[in-house]
Amino acid sequence: MLADDAAVESVALSDSNLLDRFGGSGIHVSMSTIAPETARDLAEHHAKKGVAYLASPVIGRPDRAATGTLFLLLAGEGNAKQKVQPLLKVLGQRIFDFGEKPWIANTAKLIVNFNIVAAIESMAEAFTLAVQNGIPRAKMAELLSETLFSGVAYKGYGDHVARHEYEPARLSIAVRLERRAPGFTARSRN
């Protein structure tokens, strides 16, 4: 998975003729989190070269990838999706199919990321209120993540927020996502 839109475009659309190397029967599965507009442009470029383009951004951190327990969002041409299913099943515990338009999977992923950022912000505010009233941050994290909010965002990020652990790479992605989310939501449309 590449870091951002520029990296994906650099690899897929550079002078290296990557798309020509695929030939008419190739399938490019992009698992990066990129803007829907970028995915739409990539799909158009791929179609011109006769290469199938699938978007399959993932939900899960590197430790989930190592254990094959990612969640995968998938969109693109049906036959191409069918061909890559065996590979994707090795990487993830579940595949969510978002239809024929690749950029829809990227839109769904950015919506997920927006909710992760909202959860992190909510936890930070809750922990601040807790500390101001004599409740330890760790105790509040435990309460939230084991009762009302037992989902991945609270369990996966709650302890880090409670311990003020934002680096290396634990929550730095959230800062980048938060910067992108307002622009994404303002521009998003099908």
For every predicted segment, state its role.
Residues 104-190:
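Helical "substrate-binding/catalytic lid" subdomain
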Residues 2, 46, 88-95, 148, ...:
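Structural signal for hydrophobic packing residues in well-ordered secondary-structure cores
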Residues 18-22, 45-46, 129-132:
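A short helix-coil junction within the Rossmann-fold of NAD(P)-dependent oxidoreductases
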Residues 7, 38, 79-80, 122, ...:
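Short phosphate-engaging motifs
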Residues 1-37, 71-73:
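Rossmann-like NAD(P)-binding element
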Residues 11-12, 33-113, 117:
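Rossmann-fold dinucleotide-binding core
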